[in-house]
A protein has these predicted regions:
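Zinc-dependent deaminase catalytic domain
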Residues: 1-165
């Protein structure tokens, strides 16, 4: 069956013909994770999914472990940018913290496309595909997004946009 994804386990076999259905589900999970961010201006979420559909790690934009999520730090943009860890990097850090390998995983990102700094991390840990919410890229992130696309293409990382509905 060309174009059909078969997911199996010991109990049953499930034939999935609409891969985008799973992309939308995992993107919805990334959206839920984005709500965990305490940043009042940007809520980004990401989740890494393994080859069998298992959740490997998740992350949202926020401060590192042990750094207090004080509202005045979020309100001061310069201070916030010094402290904040992007959702994509939090996925990588959380996986590392828990001893989980992301090699071959798919990363789902809700909120903004992957920036060029996070793209470096995605490439380095062996993530093979990135799916992001279909949207217009904000002007201030356009240059970074262009660099991300160049790096992903050169490194052989598949990337795509997916709508929510």
């Amino acid at each position: 069956m060309k174009g059909t994804l078969i997911l199996s386990n010991k109990l049953n076999i499930q034939i999935v013909t609409d891969k985008s259905k799973w992309d939308k589900r995992y993107l919805a999970l990334a959206k839920e994770i984005s709500t965990w961010s305490k940043d009042p201006s940007s809520q980004i979420g990401a989740v890494a999914i393994g080859s069998k559909g298992e959740v490997l790690a998740q992350g949202y934009n926020g401060f590192p472990r042990g750094i207090k999520d004080l509202q005045d730090r979020y309100n001061d943009k310069d201070r916030k940018y010094e402290l904040v860890v992007h959702a994509e990097m939090n996925v990588i850090y959380n996986a590392t913290y828990n001893g989980v390998c992301l090699n071959g995983a798919t990363l789902y990102v809700y909120g903004l496309p992957v920036c060029s700094d996070c793209a470096k991390g995605v490439i380095q840990v062996g993530i093979k595909k990135v799916v992001m919410l279909k949207q217009d890229v904000p002007l201030k992130w356009e240059k970074s997004w262009q660099k991300t696309k160049e790096m992903f293409n050169e490194a052989g990382i598949k990337w795509d946009f997916c709508s929510e509905s």
